[in-house]
């Protein structure tokens, strides 16, 4: 049990972080969206950033509403908000993974014919890959939607005697729901790890073939990408730690520790959002022109 003062402190920190992320996401979408309307085309990285900005904007609002409803025990509202949060959470994970893959194929200096073929395919079918991420998020939340519908029905009949068979089946269904949600997050995490390893290998190769006295543009691109990926790795790891704590949640008072963990995780998400803004050449060029 933590003091109420600390709970309020971390709650305020979390709200400030969330509002900052919302402003950053809105800025990314507004600036790049205007550029899209003017030139009628965007680079793939900017397409990802616009999609990620929209997804993160919606995710952050869903997260705030979901957490406050959970803290206040508003179960009826919470059941509906959880679906929205899960959808944008999975979509954000996949978009972040696609961003790492794009960094890998654009920055890495490998010349193997298989790598070059994969790079060509990804760049050619990039809009369809983005649509595929949206489809995966939609399919993944179907079990959650069914589970939440059942949960709402049980809440409306909570004054009636419970059937143990129905309760057991519901618990098994929730286990399946958790497994499907975990798989939907593990796959992009594996893609992220593979892309990071390839980038590190490419960076090592660049260091071996260039003098250490100066840093060429290729090296700078590697370091910029790896900095963003390092922050994203912390975000992914932090999220999986929260899942672990959720599993063993009986050891903690969730209402007390909720804001501590949310403030911790969204601090890294805020860092990553800032890093994404600095990693887009188009966004930096437009913002510098406005100043």
UniProtKB/Swiss-Prot annotation:
<feature type="transmembrane region" description="Helical; Name=7">
    <location>
        <begin position="258"/>
        <end position="278"/>
    </location>
</feature>
<feature type="transmembrane region" description="Helical; Name=1">
    <location>
        <begin position="2"/>
        <end position="22"/>
    </location>
</feature>
<keyword id="KW-0716">Sensory transduction</keyword>
<protein>
    <recommendedName>
        <fullName>Taste receptor type 2 member 16</fullName>
    </recommendedName>
</protein>
<keyword id="KW-0807">Transducer</keyword>
<comment type="function">
    <text>Receptor that may play a role in the perception of bitterness and is gustducin-linked. May function as a bitter taste receptor for the phytonutrient beta glucopyranosides, some of which are toxic and some of which lower the risk of cancer and cardiovascular disease. The activity of this receptor may stimulate alpha gustducin, mediate PLC-beta-2 activation and lead to the gating of TRPM5.</text>
</comment>
<comment type="similarity">
    <text>Belongs to the G-protein coupled receptor T2R family.</text>
</comment>
<feature type="transmembrane region" description="Helical; Name=6">
    <location>
        <begin position="229"/>
        <end position="249"/>
    </location>
</feature>
<feature type="topological domain" description="Extracellular">
    <location>
        <begin position="147"/>
        <end position="182"/>
    </location>
</feature>
<feature type="topological domain" description="Extracellular">
    <location>
        <begin position="250"/>
        <end position="257"/>
    </location>
</feature>
<dbReference type="Pfam" id="PF05296">
    <property type="entry name" value="TAS2R"/>
</dbReference>
<keyword id="KW-0472">Membrane</keyword>
<feature type="transmembrane region" description="Helical; Name=4">
    <location>
        <begin position="126"/>
        <end position="146"/>
    </location>
</feature>
<feature type="topological domain" description="Cytoplasmic">
    <location>
        <begin position="23"/>
        <end position="41"/>
    </location>
</feature>
<keyword id="KW-0675">Receptor</keyword>
<feature type="glycosylation site" description="N-linked (GlcNAc...) asparagine">
    <location>
        <position position="163"/>
    </location>
</feature>
<feature type="topological domain" description="Cytoplasmic">
    <location>
        <begin position="204"/>
        <end position="228"/>
    </location>
</feature>
<comment type="subunit">
    <text>Interacts with RTP3 and RTP4.</text>
</comment>
<feature type="topological domain" description="Extracellular">
    <location>
        <position position="1"/>
    </location>
</feature>
<keyword id="KW-1133">Transmembrane helix</keyword>
<dbReference type="GO" id="GO:0005886">
    <property type="term" value="C:plasma membrane"/>
</dbReference>
<keyword id="KW-0812">Transmembrane</keyword>
<dbReference type="InterPro" id="IPR007960">
    <property type="entry name" value="TAS2R"/>
</dbReference>
<feature type="glycosylation site" description="N-linked (GlcNAc...) asparagine">
    <location>
        <position position="80"/>
    </location>
</feature>
<keyword id="KW-1003">Cell membrane</keyword>
<feature type="transmembrane region" description="Helical; Name=3">
    <location>
        <begin position="85"/>
        <end position="105"/>
    </location>
</feature>
<feature type="transmembrane region" description="Helical; Name=2">
    <location>
        <begin position="42"/>
        <end position="62"/>
    </location>
</feature>
<feature type="topological domain" description="Cytoplasmic">
    <location>
        <begin position="279"/>
        <end position="291"/>
    </location>
</feature>
<keyword id="KW-0325">Glycoprotein</keyword>
<feature type="topological domain" description="Extracellular">
    <location>
        <begin position="63"/>
        <end position="84"/>
    </location>
</feature>
<keyword id="KW-0919">Taste</keyword>
<dbReference type="GO" id="GO:0004930">
    <property type="term" value="F:G protein-coupled receptor activity"/>
</dbReference>
<feature type="topological domain" description="Cytoplasmic">
    <location>
        <begin position="106"/>
        <end position="125"/>
    </location>
</feature>
<keyword id="KW-0297">G-protein coupled receptor</keyword>
<dbReference type="GO" id="GO:0033038">
    <property type="term" value="F:bitter taste receptor activity"/>
</dbReference>
<feature type="transmembrane region" description="Helical; Name=5">
    <location>
        <begin position="183"/>
        <end position="203"/>
    </location>
</feature>
